[in-house]
From Swiss-Prot:
The chain crosses the membrane at residues 25-45, 347-367, 369-389, 396-416, 440-460, 472-492, 537-557, 863-883, 888-908, 910-930, 968-988, 998-1018. The keyword Chloroplast does not apply. It is a multi-pass membrane protein. SUPFAM superfamilies: Multidrug efflux transporter AcrB pore domain, PN1, PN2, PC1 and PC2 subdomains, Multidrug efflux transporter AcrB TolC docking domain, DN and DC subdomains, Multidrug efflux transporter AcrB transmembrane domain. It comes from Salmonella heidelberg (strain SL476). InterPro entries: AcrB_DN_DC_subdom, Acrflvin-R, Multidrug-R_MdtB. GO terms for cellular component: plasma membrane. Belongs to the resistance-nodulation-cell division (RND) (TC 2.A.6) family. MdtB subfamily. This is Multidrug resistance protein MdtB.
Length: 1040
């Protein structure tokens, strides 16, 4: 595209100035498209950047962590490891549960990943234990992603088993069908079952064994095909009373005969209706409850999903008895909506402040209306493009539009100011519009494309950070582009019809006072600039010192990854001694819950104890603390966490780890604290040697707090050491021993009761109430070759040992995850460096590897690419400016203003006590685009004066600085006030917005002062350099 030079009559704006109706209709079309687009845009907390993640859960009640690892997890991992597109595979194998989490590359569609996972499970089926109660179940959900909604179902009249049955069949299934729902889990799921508790003494007295009982039950309760009779006239279906449905029927079941008399199950066992797993429990505000956690699919629209669930709830609750109460304990969308509302308010406030600044400078209602129309038009038109690109209304896109407020008004200000200058000189409005727009058209194009060039590197950022800021960068670029179009079309057309000498000269007392103030400021600036031009080397020294100071501040400033948000929900892990039982954990959680609910900021609490897909070991409990709305509590979430941990610290035998939930979830497992670091080895023995050493070293670091690990190798285990020779002589196999132990202590699911709506289990176990602990093993009896029974103690010796409570793998190798927080006064960058230094000090062997995980790993990657990102932005700007100016020298002059922005931004962050995180870095990159606009406006007019008026470079730059001082000040203040609401934000999600505002306001304040003086000096320096090069190399005809 050939750009018309300054001074032409109208340039690209001529057609639009002369055709006001067409221009008006074109702008109306943009406005209408934007309004329609806004109605179709979904609302979210952040852009969708989730990794495709699938969780595979396999439950095998009674199996030890060793058995789960070797028999279940390892076969699955071998198949999963062959899948293409797999980024990371982690697993947890604990008592009775195996959880494998598969994280795929961002580019792999979730549906494709799902198909590969299903195929891998099918391939591993033959390698899994034949008596698994259920096959592996996969869910399209990230287990570390907090639930979008938590519901508690309670009843003061019904047992939890009946409540759970109704919730599972009437509520959970329906919610699972909602589009966007990835998984509905029932914490504390007390599924109904018939529990058979054998009396070991009674069984032994009759010469029976638990295996005899199990065989009798499984043979008496079947549900299989029986065929049909097909006669000449009628067909008859065969059925029988082969199913037993109630505990009473099982109680009357004959399991053997003694001396001709029947022995019924009720004679040797307590048979009752109970729960399938008696070691699971959940509480809502200390009341027993079934807690429903609803998690979304990766990439699903969280707002739409939550709205669909809420619309469905009234109908679902009507199907439940009156005594059953369903309560929404938490809804993440409440805070998301509040955060978006606050950001929308800050956007409107930014628009109002920008318009106010325009009026302050122009002091003219018609001249203020013109940019007052251009700004919302540019922003609203952006919504149409956002819909086309499948974007959403989220915190980042709204932040982009808020920042764009200061950007988009710049173009209108530059056009209006230039046209007004000619009208004030006596030219007709139409002629002034043609001349002023033509003169400034090239400047607008330069400003626009050089600013968009700054955003280009953001589009090429890799991994999740790049995905996160793609919507931000594109939204801002589109708003700037539409603004340029509006400023070259609608703005000059409105100036030609709304501005006049009378309106511009019409002044009141306030206008005259402002004019005198601006005249004095410009005069003072002119005197200061003359002195600076007379002492160029001093000014250059200041510019060089600014560059050095920028580098120094960059090195020393604390660095972080992503601001910690206050979303009103706290996730917690309660840790107890490794040998803790379910009963002791239930008691501990009651004590902890009582302390937590006493805090004035807490609204509700859910706790869960037991082993399932979310909680790996019995000595840990999961908590979710829901806080009151931000405006209803005095403290932020970190203060509440500190207070809760202090309150619980006096309870003996527990450690409470708390962290606020975040909108951005990168981890694949629920951790105790915010940051993770892994230690991986080829064997468990190697891990057991190095874990204590590394943990002790990390705990001694002042840069880390709350250091813990998931390494638990001190769980109590009873080792049954069988004398194989003695067992063989008696005709007892190891399978017989395993079956006897499993029957007694594994809550073994031995049979299934089928109904029209659901299936229920028959659970076999020993009644250990009279013989607790290891003494229960002495009651185990086995059938010998001659049909008699033999006590287990006759062929085995019982030893008490320590064993792992869980075995964790990362990409099929044993791993331990260290969790830590960063104490006040230190940054994540400090903690990462301290860990790396500690690793070097310990001199780990080659077969031991370490790696950061989750947000810490993303922080490392982002930190390594940040400098290159800024360099890429500068290079992109240089290329664009070089093309526009057809010069190698002038772009360097423009870019020389950038260090001043860096100094201001970094100083502001340090003074405000903020870290240099990803949000602040984006602010610095945007500053690069804003600050150079000052230089562009100066240099454009200086070059035009040299070319058209024959002025010397010094006179030309001096005149350009004075002429462009007012629009430079206006545009800078507009950008500053566009960012000011973000800096001062205090509502929901303010932690996310504030670093961007602080960086931009600080950078603009410092750069505005310095660039007004350094740019003309550097311009003259490079002009002399250009003349020197031409004199030394006269054959080179390139224009510098």
């Amino acid at each position: 595209m050939q750009v018309l030079p300054p001074g032409s009559t109208g340039g690209p704006s001529r057609l639009f100035i002369l055709r006001p109706v067409a221009t008006t209709l074109l702008m109306a079309a943009i406005l209408l498209a934007g309004i329609i687009g806004y109605r179709f845009l979904p609302v979210a907390a952040l852009p969708e950047v989730d990794y495709p993640t699938i969780q595979v859960v396999t439950l095998y009640p009674g199996a030890s962590p060793d058995v789960m690892t070797s028999a279940v997890t390892a076969p699955l991992e071998r198949q999963f490891g062959q899948m293409s597109g797999l980024k990371q595979m982690s697993s947890q194998s604990s008592g009775g549960a195996s959880v494998v989490t598969l994280q795929f590359q961002l580019t792999l569609p979730l549906d494709v990943a799902e198909q590969e996972v299903q195929a891998a499970i099918n391939a591993a089926t033959n390698l899994l234990p034949s008596d698994l109660p259920n096959p592996p179940i996969y869910s399209k959900v990230n287990p570390a992603d907090p639930p979008i909604m938590t519901l508690a179902v309670t009843s003061n009249a019904m047992p939890m088993t009946q409540v759970e049955d109704m919730v599972e069949t009437r509520v959970a299934q329906k919610i699972s069908q909602v589009s966007g729902v990835g998984l509905v889990t029932l914490a504390g799921g007390q599924r109904p079952a018939v529990r058979v508790k054998l009396n070991a003494q009674a069984v032994a007295a009759l010469g029976l064994t638990s295996e005899t009982v199990r065989t009798a039950i499984t043979g008496a309760n079947v549900n299989s095909a029986k065929g049909s009779l097909d006669g000449p006239e009628r067909a008859v279906t065969l059925s029988a009373n082969d199913q037993m449905q109630s505990a009473d029927e099982y109680r009357r079941l004959i399991i053997a005969y003694q001396n001709g008399a029947p022995v019924r199950l009720g004679d040797v066992a307590t048979v009752e209706q109970g729960a399938e797993n008696s070691w699971l429990g959940a509480w809502a505000n200390q009341a027993p409850a079934i807690v429903m956690n609803v998690q979304r699919q990766p990439g699903a629209n969280i707002i739409a999903t939550a709205d669909s669930i809420r619309q469905m709830l009234p109908q679902l609750t009507e199907s439940l008895p009156k005594s059953v109460k369903v309560t929404v304990l938490s809804d993440r969308t409440t805070n998301i909506r509040a955060s978006v509302r606050d950001t929308q308010f800050e956007l409107m406030l930014a628009i109002a402040l920008v318009v106010m600044i325009i009026y302050l400078f122009l002091r003219n209602i018609p001249a203020t209306i013109i940019p007052g129309v251009a700004v919302p038009l540019s922003l609203i038109g952006t919504f149409a493009v956002m819909v086309f690109l499948d974007f959403s209304i989220n915190n980042l896109t709204l932040m982009a539009l808020t920042i764009a407020t200061g950007f988009v008004v710049d173009d209108a200000i530059v056009v209006i100011e230039n046209i007004s200058r000619y009208i004030e000189k006596g030219e007709k409005p139409l002629a002034a519009a043609l001349k002023g727009a033509g003169e400034i058209g090239f400047t607008i194009i330069s400003l626009t494309f050089s600013l968009i060039a700054v955003l280009i590197p953001l589009l090429f950022m890799g991994d999740i950070v790049g995905r996160l800021f793609r919507e931000f960068a594109v939204t801002l670029a589109v708003a700037i582009l539409i603004s340029a179009v509006v400023s070259l079309t609608l703005t000059p057309m409105m100036c030609a019809r709304m501005l006049s000498q009378q309106s511009l000269r019409k002044q009141n007392r306030f206008s005259r006072a402002c004019e005198r103030m601006f005249d004095r400021v410009i005069a003072s600036y002119g005197r200061g600039l003359a002195k600076v031009l007379n002492h160029p080397w001093l000014t250059l020294s200041v510019a060089f010192a600014t560059l050095l100071l920028s580098v120094m501040l960059w090195i020393v400033i604390p660095k972080g990854f992503f601001p910690v948000q206050d979303n009103g929900i706290i996730q917690g892990t309660l840790q107890a001694p490794q040998s803790s039982s379910y009963a002791s954990m239930a008691q501990r959680q009651r004590q902890v819950a009582e302390r937590i609910l006493q805090d004035p900021a807490v609204q509700s609490l859910t706790t869960f104890v037991g082993v399932d897909g979310a909680n790996p070991t019995l000595n840990s409990a999961r908590l979710q603390i829901n806080l009151k709305p931000l405006d209803a509590r005095d403290d932020r979430v970190q203060q509440v966490i500190s207070r809760l941990q202090t309150a619980v610290a006096t309870i003996p035998g527990v450690a409470l780890y708390l962290q606020p939930t975040q909108d951005l979830t990168i981890d694949t497992q629920v951790s105790r604290t915010q940051y993770q670091f892994t230690l991986q080895a080829t064997t468990l023995d190697a891990l057991s040697h190095w874990v204590p050493k590394l943990q002790n070293a990390l705990q001694s670091l002042p840069q880390l707090s709350e250091v813990s690990s998931d390494w638990q190798d001190r769980g109590l285990a009873a080792w049954v050491n069988v004398d194989r020779d003695s067992a063989s002589r008696l005709g007892i196999s190891m399978a017989d021993v395993d079956n006897a132990l499993y029957n007694a202590f594994g809550q073994r699911l031995i049979s299934t009761i089928y109904t029209q709506a659901n299936q229920y289990r028959v659970v076999l176990e020993h009644n250990t109430a009279s013989t607790p602990g290891l003494a229960a093993l002495e009651t185990i009896r086995l059938t010998s070759r001659d049909g008699g029974t033999v006590p287990l103690s006759a062929i085995a010796r019982i030893e008490q040992r320590f064993a792992p409570l869980s075995i964790n793998h990362l990409d099929q190798f044993p791993v331990t995850t260290f969790s830590f927080n960063v104490p006040e006064g230190y940054s994540l960058g400090d903690a990462v460096q301290a860990i790396l230094d500690t690793e070097k000090t310990l001199a780990l062997p080659a077969d031991i590897t370490t790696q950061f995980q989750g947000s810490t790993l993303a922080f490392q990657a982002a930190l390594g690419s940040t400098v290159w990102l800024i360099v890429a932005a500068v290079v992109a700007m240089y290329i664009v400016l070089g093309v526009l100016y057809e010069s190698f020298i002038h772009p360097i002059t423009i870019l020389s203003t950038l260090p001043t922005a860096g100094v201001g931004a970094l100083l502001a962050l340090i003074i405000a006590g903020s870290e240099l995180d990803i949000i602040a870095i984006i602010g610095i990159i945007l500053l690069i685009g804003i600050v150079k606009k000052n230089a562009i406006m100066m240099i454009d007019f200086a070059l035009a004066a040299e070319r058209e008026q024959g002025m010397s470079p010094r006179d030309a730059i001096f005149q350009a600085c004075l002429l462009r001082f007012r629009p430079i000040l206006m545009t800078t203040l507009a950008a500053l006030l566009g960012a000011l609401p973000l800096m001062l934000s205090t509502g929901v999600g303010a932690e996310l917005r504030r670093p961007l505002g602080i960086a931009m306001v600080g950078g603009l304040l410092v750069s505005q002062v310095l660039t007004l003086f350094t740019t003309p000096v550097i311009y003259l320096l490079f002009d002399r350099l250009s003349l020197y090069v031409k004199s030394r190399f006269p054959r080179h005809k390139e224009e510098a």
